[in-house]
Amino acid sequence: MLPFSLDTVRLFLHVTAAAVWVGGQLTLLGLLPVLRGLSPEAPKLAARRFNTLAWSAFVVLFVTGIWNLLAESPGSMGTAWNVTLGLKLLMVAATGIAAAFHAGATSKAVLAAGGAISLVAGLAAVALGIMLASAPT
C-alpha cells in the first residue's frame, strides 16, 4: 500500500472542497425547477443553506491552493505550466467574485449572470487544475 502523507491530506482537502463548491452549484442548478415548484421561497432557502457550506469550501480551496503552490514550486515548472496556473487562478477569482455577486443579487439579471459565470469559471478552474496535476514534471 502507498504511504499516507501530508500530500494526501492536502490533495484530499483540495479535491473535496472543489467537489463541494462546483458540485454543489451543479446540484442546485439541477434542483432549481423542483425547488421552484415547492414554493417561491424554497430556492432562496436552499441557496442560503448552501452558501454556508459553499463559502467554507471556497476558503478550504484557497488555503489548500496556496499549500499546493508551496508544494509544487511553480518557479521550477515550465512556461506552459505557469500560464495554465495563471489561467486557473483567474478562473478561481472569477468564480468567487461571480458567486459573491450572485449571493448578494437584488435583480434577476445579476442573480442569473452571477450564478452562470461562477459555475462556468468553477468548471474551468477544475479542468485547468486537472491539467496542472497531470502535466509531466
Q: Where in this protein do the model-derived segments appear?
A:
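Polytopic transmembrane helical bundles with strong interfacial aromatic enrichment
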Residues: 1-137
